[in-house]
């Protein structure tokens, strides 16, 4: 997303985060439902834009912890949709990024939650994806 890096320095300690324009500080990732990424049609996808190897990206299926999501290189689904609607120049073509994560829920799963923790231990609000409506 459109934004900028913020660095906070206290004495000899430094922390940083990415601040997305129009969003609160704790908006650090976006979740895409199954079927959004055509190469991974059964997976729920998380885009964690300021991710590095010290971050944790975990998922829960119907409240049960399932562990770490699997990182993969991919293209931004939002940008692919945007570019697909327009005739674009070569310089606007999508670029592969390294900050995508996938989890494949069971067929009977009703809800997936994703939790992200940054390198400084900040836990960002869980995001949910409803897979099956309540009966």
PLM-predicted stretches and their roles:
Residues 133-135:
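Extracellular interdomain linker/stem segments of modular secreted and single-pass surface proteins
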Residues 1-51, 55-58, 98-106, 111-130:
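Binuclear metal-dependent phosphoesterase catalytic core
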Residues 76-102:
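Aromatic sugar-binding surface patches on proteins
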């Amino acid at each position: 997303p459109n934004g900028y890096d913020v660095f906070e320095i206290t004495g000899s300690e430094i922390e940083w985060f990415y601040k997305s324009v129009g969003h609160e500080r704790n908006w650090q990732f976006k979740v895409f439902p199954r079927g959004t990424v055509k190469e991974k049609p059964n997976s729920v996808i998380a885009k964690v834009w300021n991710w590095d190897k010290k971050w944790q990206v975990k998922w829960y299926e119907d409240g049960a912890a399932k562990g770490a999501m699997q990182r993969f290189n991919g293209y931004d689904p939002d940008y692919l949709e945007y570019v697909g609607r327009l005739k674009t120049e070569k310089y606007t073509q999508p670029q592969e990024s390294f900050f995508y994560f996938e989890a494949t829920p069971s067929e009977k799963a009703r809800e997936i939650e994703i939790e992200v923790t940054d390198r400084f231990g900040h836990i960002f609000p869980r995001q949910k994806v409803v897979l099956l409506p309540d009966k």
